[in-house]
């Protein structure tokens, strides 16, 4: 990257922090197949304090976790230990007990029925199993309230044993599916998901700052979460996911740094090859990057908890699909991303994209709630 382009990129970060109500701190990086060619930071780790945010600052990466969990599942597929068409109940019998929400009675109590078919691993990977999130579904939130079901952020198994909002395979709906995928990986490997990731992703890629449980070194570099009030003002929020978690949440539980995530992105850009070992076969990466939905499209989300997320959609009006497990832009975007580019995000306004066609990818990381915060767009 030449100096002019670096200055332009740096100014985006600086302006994001400097503007009224802007992000307290941001880290952004861009990589090609070989190495990062842009690294930028601006701001502080916590609003009201002076310690600057740095390239090695640790973030709660939330749903950026999903791609790594999906990778551990696809490794099982490569080894012939599972098939995407397998019923999930074969590995996690508890999932067969989850029923479909069929409305509420006059007392606000859920009316439930059995699903019309078993949930498959494929449906979990593609977000078509029927699960939602309490902060993206009024019905899911009402069910949890009526049944006093734990929140998904409790990092407990009970937090994902909620309800199906539609029958398996009926439509695309973003939800706790990858948490169940993580349970499948644990059942097959006989280890916690974090151990599997450590052995099969983090070690081969040299990702030394990624974990479900913060190490003392990671905690010393942790960037604070912040919340934006209705008046637009930001304030630090002293929230850390349960340490250690009862369950390694495959949908949202990882902490990590941007440099670590760039190593994962480079592995995908290099068709599964890491600097010291192969993590995935080329054919697997190609499958992960292709649409797996049949007759369905992925879309946006509607908030049911405005403190955690705004309503929104990535690239509204453009056709989008879902792979294993990324969103895919099926059409070129106004910002110049080609059709077939894969991407996703994390709840605290973290965003990543992987352009395999042109061999580049990047990440933008902040720690602000609600999702789709104005300072991150």
Model-based region annotation:
Residues 36-37, 234, 361:
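Hydrophobic "anchor" residues
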Residues 368-377:
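Generic C-terminus detector
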């Amino acid at each position: 990257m030449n100096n002019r382009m670096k200055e332009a990129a740096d100014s985006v970060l600086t302006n994001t922090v400097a503007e009224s109500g802007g992000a307290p701190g941001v880290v952004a990086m861009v990589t090609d197949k070989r190495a990062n060619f842009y690294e930028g930071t601006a701001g502080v780790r916590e609003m009201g304090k002076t310690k600057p945010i740095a390239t090695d600052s640790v973030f709660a990466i939330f749903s950026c976790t999903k791609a790594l969990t999906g990778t551990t599942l696809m490794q099982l597929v490569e080894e012939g230990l599972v098939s995407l068409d397998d019923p999930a109940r074969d590995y996690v019998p508890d999932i067969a007990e989850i029923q479909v929400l069929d409305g509420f009675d006059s007392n606000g109590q859920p009316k439930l029925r059995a699903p019309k078919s078993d949930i498959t691993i494929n449906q979990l990977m593609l977000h078509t199993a029927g699960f939602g999130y309490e902060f993206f579904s009024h019905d899911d939130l009402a069910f949890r309230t009526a049944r006093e079901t734990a929140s998904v952020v409790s990092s407990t198994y009970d937090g994902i044993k909620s309800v199906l909002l539609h029958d398996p395979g009926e439509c695309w709906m973003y939800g706790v599916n990858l948490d169940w995928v993580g349970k499948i990986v644990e059942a097959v490997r006989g280890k916690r998901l974090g151990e599997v990731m450590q052995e099969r992703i983090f070690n081969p890629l040299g990702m030394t700052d990624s974990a479900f449980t913060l190490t003392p070194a990671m905690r010393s570099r942790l960037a604070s979460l912040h919340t934006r009030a209705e008046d637009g003002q930001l304030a630090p929020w002293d929230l850390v996911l349960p340490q250690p978690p009862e369950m390694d949440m495959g949908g949202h539980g990882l902490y990590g740094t941007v440099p670590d995530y760039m190593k994962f992105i480079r592995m995908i850009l290099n068709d599964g090859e890491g600097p010291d070992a192969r993590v995935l076969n080329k054919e697997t990466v190609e499958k992960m990057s292709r649409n797996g939905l049949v007759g369905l499209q992925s879309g946006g989300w509607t908030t049911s908890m405005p403190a955690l997320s705004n309503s929104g959609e990535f690239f509204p009006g453009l056709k989008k699909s879902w792979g294993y497990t990324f969103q895919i832009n099926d059409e070129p975007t106004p910002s110049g991303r080609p059709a077939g580019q894969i991407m996703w995000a994390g709840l605290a306004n973290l965003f990543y994209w992987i352009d395999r066609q042109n061999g580049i990818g990047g990440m933008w990381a902040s720690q602000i709630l609600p999702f789709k915060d104005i300072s991150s767009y």
